[in-house]
Amino acid sequence: MRSLLLGTLCLLAVALAAEVKKPVEAAAPGTAEKLSSKATTLAERSTGLAFSLYQAMAKDQAVENILLSPLVVASSLGLVSLGGKATTASQAKAVLSAEKLRDEEVHTGLGELVRSLSNSTARNVTWKLGSRLYGPSSVSFADDFVRSSKQHYNCEHSKINFRDKRSALQSINEWASQTTDGKLPEVTKDVERTDGALLVNAMFFKPHWDEKFHHKMVDNRGFMVTRSYTVGVTMMHRTGLYNYYDDEKEKLQLVEMPLAHKLSSLIILMPHHVEPLERLEKLLTKEQLKTWMGKMQKKAVAISLPKGVVEVTHDLQKHLAGLGLTEAIDKNKADLSRMSGKKDLYLASVFHATAFEWDTEGNPFDQDIYGREELRSPKLFYADHPFIFLVRDNQSGSLLFIGRLVRPKGDKMRDEL
């Protein structure tokens, strides 16, 4: 079947090349903002945090799909350190491995980093991002904290009354929907602890490819969640030249797909065959990723990816606690007195909610490429089973996103033998 798919993709590629009548030049690459030394340092720290947090979440049996923005998580830690005192503040910096940086360096550096890497215009991606800190109706946020958190982290603030829980949840979800232009209609159906502060990050991210998928190269296929469970999904296909590596020893493939303006790339790691991702996740470290990427070579690759929107909400509270953020979430120990002027507040939840859209859009493809000899026998990267993916900034090496797709939206198709 895969041989047939490969032949079909090659024929479609040639046919589509002939269909394009007028050559269209790709958009000029964007210009990356030069980061300061403190922002560069925090980019490195946030990447380390990305792998630590991902590994912690991957071990949670209750978690299927994972979708994290390490930049946004780092900003959440910065916000806690801004509003905290003593050990509560120092723990937040320690989780970010920023203990040796002055507070002002952390806040200005993180602010600069997020503004630069989430600049949708410069990067030609769609990234809608909002952060809001909800406090109990009995608590008032201090003016200095409101001003500083808005300046550095673009964080909004609001009181919320959970006496009417249904109305409170509706308010949170409506804000998230408005922030993402309706792409993320719901953050959560429930809040367990309602006597503390809720930090909510709501995001919508849509990569625009350096070379788009053609809209005709889309069809319905099966995605094997496990060997015995398959769901129906829409798949998109294209053949092009990509950085690619096949680790035959570890039985996995990597492909790097540049995004429009080539300031960032999407990297996908996938086992050769359907299997739980636990084996790959044990291999995945910052250093191992660097090693794999160093072995990549430009090759012709026929890529098939699921098409659609993946919506994921994580309450990061317990996972951050596992990395060392224990005081801020403890009602009896938290000192967030810079937030409210009193030691009367703790962090009850850290909601990290994202809608990530896999779509065909991007720069016009170069139709001349399909006449080249090197595209005659492409490698096949058929993502019809669970995989890990990362969106990486090519200048700083910082990760905009890290995640895994285990169960896309779709109805059960059949049981496999």
Swiss-Prot record:
The gene is Serpinh1. Binds specifically to collagen. Could be involved as a chaperone in the biosynthetic pathway of collagen. It comes from the Eukaryota. Keywords: Acetylation, Chaperone, Endoplasmic reticulum, Glycoprotein, Phosphoprotein, Signal, Stress response. This is Serpin H1. It comes from Rattus norvegicus. It is found in: Endoplasmic reticulum lumen. Gene3D superfamilies: Alpha-1-antitrypsin, domain 1, Antithrombin, subunit I, domain 2. Residues 1-17 form the signal peptide. PANTHER family: SERINE PROTEASE INHIBITOR, SERPIN, SERPIN H1. Belongs to the serpin family.
